[in-house]
Amino acid sequence: MAILSISSEFGTGALEIGRELRNYFGYEYIGIGRLLREAKEAAKQMNLFVAKGRQESIDSWGGNEFMSFMAMLHSVILEHAAKDNVILLTRGSNYLVKGIPHALGIRIVAPLDYRIERFMKKEGVNRETARLLVKQADREIDCALHIAYGKGLDDPEAYEIKFDTGTQKQEEIVEIVKNLLESKDALKTPEAQKLIQMRALVARIKAKVVINPGFYSTTLEMEIKGDGILLRGVVSGKAEQKEIEKEAREIARSVPLICDLDCQSTRKKKS
């Protein structure tokens, strides 16, 4: 079957749309709350942020810690996507599955006043409180996407079709998405499945590598090259280079891995 990735503004009713599609297709439904919990648990198991004497909490979302956690979150998202028959309702998943033939990325929006009204009814709060909370959620989501992907909330490259729950009924949106997903299902081939599995593998390697304190995680570049993976970046020395290559190859297993890691210590000696 297919993969559905839903990007939405806060308070649009995307949650209800996702659940209705889950009930129809029998897909596994995975929201941001579950993904964050799984990413945090995976981070703990891999000793993220406490490796090599680092004592930062995984709840401190700043600098390298944020990027390391995002790498872990991306890995969790792609592991679920690689299983297929899944609905992902989380920020950024559209970017991660873009270009996968059997993946459908959609965007759900609504006017601010409509979203405020929905939030008031759902949470039982007054208009001003609802307005402040909805706008705060918009800012936080937009900021997170800019940091993680260099893109904003409404980037048209991140979705195939856009819906407005302020003007379109939920049933209408659900019916359109049903038809699109059934069309996407026909595009699932062994090659398409291999592509999403390779992306999941790349994300898993990246999540493991960036926890290494000797690695400048902001320099990390990984890409699929044919049947293999290319890893580029800057490390602080030969010891870290060997350690990172060892960890990456352990995860890649039989998949060919090319490591192109530049040592800072070597460059300093040359200069």
Task: Give each language-model segment a name.
Residues 80-110, 114, 118-120:
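RNA pseudouridine synthases
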Residues 99, 110-113, 117-121, 138, ...:
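N-terminal targeting leaders
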Residues 35-88, 125:
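ATP-dependent small-molecule kinase phosphotransfer cores
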Residues 4, 30, 87, 104-106, ...:
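Hydrophobic/aromatic beta-strand patches that form the interior of the parallel beta-sheet core
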Residues 4-21:
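Glycine-rich phosphate-binding P-loop
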Residues 27-37:
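A short beta-strand-loop structural module common to alpha/beta enzyme folds
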